[in-house]
């Protein structure tokens, strides 16, 4: 929802899942991403359609720094779709446009920012764009004294390293899988689904601390080591 494991929740602009709409899209970039097992997601920066050229360039820089190939966006200049301004909107079908409009709750004046790649890359890209838009629009103005404490849980137990071609422990190799998921360690196709008994406490986008429940059984620890 926020593209970060230490989310800033004092403003909205949550990440929206759009992958299912673009499996057979006329926009090749999105279609290829879905075919390759990636995702297509977006955020709606409310009221930011009047963004300047300089600000667009800055958002593009942020996206590329996070691993994106570029910046795909739509400026919603008016109440009808013929007022949507974007280098990519001409490739979308009417059905795709209607789905985007509904899922993102698009209104006149909005700016839509897309991400398409692996899940991890898209989360990072849109998470950073979300924070950059907040800074550009002063979305936290008047909220400086708000204290949004929350727990972040259900972290993945394992993460796949594309460069090294192997699985690693996201937290550490002694972290316990969620109850009932221990047997999934025997099935490599399920490793990405396993959640960890780990948790962080976050305040206003800053991690204050965290921890985990450890593995105490020798056989379970051996299974974990065999994965790594």
List the predicted regions and their residue ranges.
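Class II aminoacyl-tRNA synthetase catalytic cores and aaRS-like
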Residues: 1-228
């Amino acid at each position: 929802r926020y593209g970060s494991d230490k989310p800033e929740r004092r403003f909205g602009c949550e990440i929206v899942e759009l992958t299912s709409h673009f499996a057979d899209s006329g926009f090749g970039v999105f279609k290829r991403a879905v075919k390759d097992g990636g995702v297509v997601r977006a955020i709606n920066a409310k009221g930011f359609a009047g963004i300047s050229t300089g600000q667009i360039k800055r958002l593009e820089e942020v996206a590329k720094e996070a691993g994106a190939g570029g910046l795909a966006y739509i400026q919603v200049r008016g109440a009808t779709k013929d007022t949507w301004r974007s280098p990519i909107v001409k490739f979308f079908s009417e059905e795709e446009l209607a789905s985007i409009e509904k899922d993102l709750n698009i209104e006149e004046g909005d700016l839509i920012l897309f991400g398409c790649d692996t899940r991890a890359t898209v989360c990072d890209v849109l998470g950073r764009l979300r924070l950059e838009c907040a800074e550009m629009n002063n979305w936290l103005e008047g909220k400086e004294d708000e204290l949004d404490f929350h727990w972040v849980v259900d972290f993945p137990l394992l993460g796949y390293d594309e460069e090294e071609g192997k699985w690693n422990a996201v937290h550490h190799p002694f972290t316990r899988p969620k109850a009932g998921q221990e047997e999934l360690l025997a099935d490599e196709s399920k490793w990405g689904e396993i959640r960890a008994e780990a948790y962080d406490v976050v305040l206003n986008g800053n991690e204050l601390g965290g921890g985990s429940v450890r593995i105490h059984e020798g056989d379970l620890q051996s299974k974990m080591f065999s994965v790594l």
